Amino acid sequence: MDFDSVLSIASQNQGLSSLPKRYSLKTGPPKKDLKVGGVNSAAVQAFLKKKAVEQKNKEQQDKKAKEDLLAKRVELKSDRKARAMASRTKDNFRGYNGIPVIDQPKKRQSKGSSTEEQQSSTKYEGGDYDDEDNFDYEGTDSESEPSRPVKPQAISRPEYSNRVENKPKKLSAPARPASSSMNFADLLKLAEKKQFEPVELKVVKKTEERLRTAEEIRELEMERRVKKLDKGKDVRSDKNSGQKDSRSQTSSNPQKKHVDRDGKNGRFPRPSEEKHQSSSTSKKPKLQASSERTPTSAKLHGDRSNSGSSGALNSKSAMKNGASFQAKQAPPRPSQGQRPATPSDLTPRKGNVSLTQAKSSISGSCPPGAARPGQGPHKNSAHGRPSNFSTSGPSQKPANPGKLSRPGSNAPPRPGGSGVVRPFTGDPSKQPRPGGNLQSQQFPGSSRASLNGPKRMERGVSGSQINRMSSGPGRSQCTVVSETISTKNITPRPGMVQRPPGPQGPRTVIGPSGHRILVKPSGPALPPITSSYKRKFEDEEEYDSEMDDFIDDEGEDQDEISKHIREIFGYDKNKYKDESDYALKFMESSWKEQQKEEARSLRMAVLEDEEEERRELEEMQRKNAKKRK
């Protein structure tokens, strides 16, 4: 189509639209970006490849540098660790090359060192490094350390597995000559192989110990002491119970001879076990009329015995004797084997005191056969009653024969725990009236040995005496240590339950070998002595359920708190800045002072209540007066 034809068509169409269109606002089709020619894709690929290679080289160099550093570091670290472990386990390290020089495996090692050894052996195989030797390097362990697990050079896999299986063994002993041949690259490969193999590690839990307060330190000391004593008691009682038959028989014979011989001269030996009891028992004696005998219906109290308490065993065999004495018969005595002679026996010891006292009052009138140990029937039918028989006064606190002493010679009896005994002579013709002042043989150092007046021991023998008593029933006589016990000062502890007063204390009966035997009278059975009667130590920080919801204001400002304290109590903290907390811990008031304070505050509270009531009454009166107006 040429230009003329176009013009002619245009002229024809000219009249179709009065307004000719000059410009159009329509956007045309988008233009395609023309490709820039001459770009070589192979060149681009080569460039990218070059960059990747460079980066890889750089990474390898970094890795190598890092590995060198790590190798040096591991070497230093393991050397330090090995030295630390060597000093701890006393292994034979002569200079450190990574392997302890041990020619043959040692004998069984302690548990602690075996766990250390196990940890060190397992960490070689890519295990955890956080054992107790790692404490001073943990700050630097930021990077991953694949080369770490490669401490012992040239140890082959079978040796490794062997060591992991036999964990308690020491590092296996044969000298390894090939240790230097394995280079670092081989070690790295070995480590890479091993790093995914599972290693069983027993985690040793370390309980963090916090600093203790003064009270806690004291408590721990007490507990330790008590545990030691308990251990000692168990060992001693085991030994002694093995020897009890032979010892009791041999010991009671010389004892009898001593008493008989000295009874004629009018002076009486005091075997060593009585020596510290003289003061307490000499206060006890008060002669009783024959009407105040134990009732024949006395209950036997042997069932309370337990194997650990030799006092209880003693009372059990005592009950058999006691029953026959009560019924005034003369059956055969139990053989000596039934009476244990452990050092903790309180009853035999006390028996000797009453035996000598009784003999002193009748001046050897007792038949010598009466004190012979292995004898058959008691040679006592001449008198209506057994010749050595002790009763205790009606007002006396009851004792608990079944649990008279804890095992071990160091156990002091609880208050009310030891029977208070008043010996009298069994021969009715020679028996004095209760009011009479028959002088028992006065022991040197004892506070009051005369048997006159109604003085009675209301508490048991204090524990300090029994602690120092020698063991064994038949020791030779020795000097008496004078030691008086004031019964007035012994007050019950605040938390202690009072023992119910019984009708009468247990009667004591002199056994065939001169040992005293306790017989429980009729009446309600006493509750067993529990640990609440004898607290090992006062600890004021024990758990208290009422303190569960105690408000702890640790978050608050200390100055704010001390300001309130100053307002309430008038105590200014700033005045006492030099006082250490440790010193303040020991400035605690005694129980007596606390009781005084309690009483004072109670009085103040009562006064305040009265004041308040008075105020309320006045207020009511005023209101009533207003209403009336």
UniProtKB/Swiss-Prot annotation:
Residues 523-629 are annotated as: Important for interaction with histones. Pfam families: SPT2, SPT2_N. GO terms for cellular component: nucleolus. Residues 127-144 have a biased composition (Acidic residues). It is found in: Nucleus, Nucleolus. GO terms for biological process: heterochromatin formation; nucleosome assembly; regulation of DNA-templated transcription; transcription by RNA polymerase I. The keyword Transcription applies. Its main location: nucleus. Residues 111-123, 278-297, 305-327, 335-345, 353-364, 387-398, 437-450, 462-490 have a biased composition (Polar residues). Keywords: Coiled coil, DNA-binding, Nucleus, Transcription, Transcription regulation. PANTHER family: PROTEIN SPT2 HOMOLOG, YEAST SPT2-RELATED. Belongs to the SPT2 family. Histone chaperone that stabilizes pre-existing histone tetramers and regulates replication-independent histone exchange on chromatin. Required for normal chromatin refolding in the coding region of transcribed genes, and for the suppression of spurious transcription. Binds DNA and histones and promotes nucleosome assembly (in vitro). Facilitates formation of tetrameric histone complexes containing histone H3 and H4. Modulates RNA polymerase 1-mediated transcription. Binds DNA, with a preference for branched DNA species, such as Y-form DNA and Holliday junction DNA. Interacts with histones. Interacts with a heterotetrameric complex formed by histone H3 and H4, especially when the histone tetramer is not bound to DNA. This is Protein SPT2 homolog. It comes from Danio rerio. The gene is spty2d1.
